[in-house]
Curated annotation (Swiss-Prot):
It comes from the Bacteria. PANTHER family: 54S RIBOSOMAL PROTEIN L1, MITOCHONDRIAL, LARGE RIBOSOMAL SUBUNIT PROTEIN UL1M. Transmembrane segments: none annotated. This is Large ribosomal subunit protein uL1. The keyword Endoplasmic reticulum does not apply. Part of the 50S ribosomal subunit.
Length: 230
């Protein structure tokens, strides 16, 4: 793929052989963003563990993601009022089941009470492929819909590695201050290390980098980052 002159010029600002401190990396990633919009700062980290299917969890970012998260809640009765008061964008039971079964997915996160999961489970072909299926481990199958909605709205994100063992996450907008982005990244690393399987051997995080949506990847000193968050 041929790169433009601007990309090549920005790339020269980053020493590809160097692992930067977190503060340096965040500043460089923002400075080498070449989008005309307020891009997202994204992290990529390689997980060193044999059973990747068991590596997943949720992370609450202290400063949110900067995105407006639309939350749908499948629930009945009084729980519907509870969900609406917490800020849910779409609330319902069989009416929403029918709408989603038709392929509608104009929302970013989905919560369900346990008594709705028999019907919600049938939406696997629609919700599953978009990563929207509610799951107990992710805290999205719950009777406490108010807490779930508020956490999702505030920037709670779910993580899982891809087939290559790499976790990709957006951790805030490039317009965030460096300190806020660093706080969010430290929260990600702390959560990953807290969730580290007990039988994981060696360095659990093998590499770590940050980049804007349209920007240059910047390597972070992963050992320094991990040591600051354990």
């Amino acid at each position: 793929m041929k790169r433009g002159k601007k990309y090549i010029q920005l790339k020269e600002k980053v020493d590809r052989t160097k692992a930067y401190t977190l503060g340096e990396a965040v500043g460089l990633a923002k400075a080498t963003s070449y989008s005309k919009f307020d891009g997202t700062l994204e992290i990529s980290t390689k997980i060193n563990y044999k059973s990747l299917q068991n590596v997943r969890g949720t992370i609450s970012l202290p400063h949110g993601t900067g995105k407006t998260i639309k939350v749908l809640v499948f629930c009945k009765g009084d729980k519907q009022n509870e969900a609406r008061e917490a800020g849910a964008d779409f609330v319902g039971d069989m009416d929403l089941i029918e709408k989603v079964s038709g392929g509608w997915t104009d929302f970013d996160a989905c919560v369900a009470t346990p008594d709705m999961m028999k019907e919600v489970g049938k939406l696997g072909p629609v919700l599953g492929r978009k990563g929207l299926m509610p799951k107990p481990k992710a805290g999205t199958v719950t009777t406490d819909v108010s807490k779930a909605v508020k956490e999702l709205k505030a920037g709670r994100i779910e993580y899982r590695p891809d087939k290559g063992g790499v976790v990709h996450l957006g951790v805030g907008k490039c317009s965030f201050s460096d300190d806020k982005l660093s706080d969010n990244i430290n929260a990600v690393v702390a959560a990953l290390m807290k969730d580290k399987p007990s039988d994981a051997k060696g360095d659990y995080l093998k590499s770590f980098s940050v980049a804007a949506t349209m920007g240059i990847g910047v390597k972070v000193d992963v050992k320094e980052l991990v040591n600051a968050n354990i």
